């Protein structure tokens, strides 16, 4: 992780920034990335700044709890949960966040969740996932991992045809759950 990139992202005039602790960080760099992102979240935040989201490792992954310990700070607006396949995975994180929020004291609002659906099982459960917690504000489609599970080559042209059903199903689930729909994770 490069501190310069974190600083630049947080200084942009955008609605939201997603900092990454998952696939975008090499295993040997995870501890450094956690420290840098944790420190960045602790710095000035509030009106006029982008919302701050962090993509943590997946529920059940050995690194997820260390990720949460590093980023659960007052400057965190939300998490991006990757590779979600069941509503129970959302509920696990919801419970962890509720405990942290209770211990941390009053906040302006609860930590929000954007959910990344990246597998056929997740796609089939998308509506239940999107409605598993009031924290869920967005549903994302991770085409690369989804395609990999289907054995498809990573090819944007093929993706347009082969992923049409999955993308459409995410849109329908997101609209039915009344959450934002984000593509291209």
Give, region by region, the residue ranges found by the protein language model.
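Expand to "…catalyze enediolate/carbanion chemistry for C-C bond making/breaking, isomerization
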Residues: 1-185
């Amino acid at each position: 992780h490069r501190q310069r990139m974190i600083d630049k992202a947080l200084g942009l005039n955008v609605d939201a920034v997603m900092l990454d602790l998952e696939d975008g960080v090499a295993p040997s760099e995870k501890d450094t990335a956690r420290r840098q992102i944790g420190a960045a979240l602790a710095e000035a935040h509030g009106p006029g700044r982008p919302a701050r989201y962090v993509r943590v490792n997946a529920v059940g992954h050995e690194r997820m709890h260390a990720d949460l310990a590093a980023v659960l700070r007052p400057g965190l607006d939300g998490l991006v949960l990757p590779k979600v396949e069941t509503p129970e995975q959302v509920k696990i994180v919801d419970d962890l966040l509720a405990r942290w929020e209770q211990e941390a004291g009053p906040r302006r609002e609860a930590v929000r969740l954007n959910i990344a659906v990246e597998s056929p099982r997740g796609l089939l459960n998308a509506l239940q996932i999107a409605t598993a917690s009031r924290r869920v504000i967005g549903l994302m489609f991770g085409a690369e991992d989804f395609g990999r599970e289907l054995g498809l080559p990573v090819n944007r042209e093929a993706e347009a045809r082969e992923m049409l059903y999955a993308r459409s199903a995410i849109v329908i689930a997101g609209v039915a759950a009344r959450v934002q729909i984000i593509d291209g994770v």
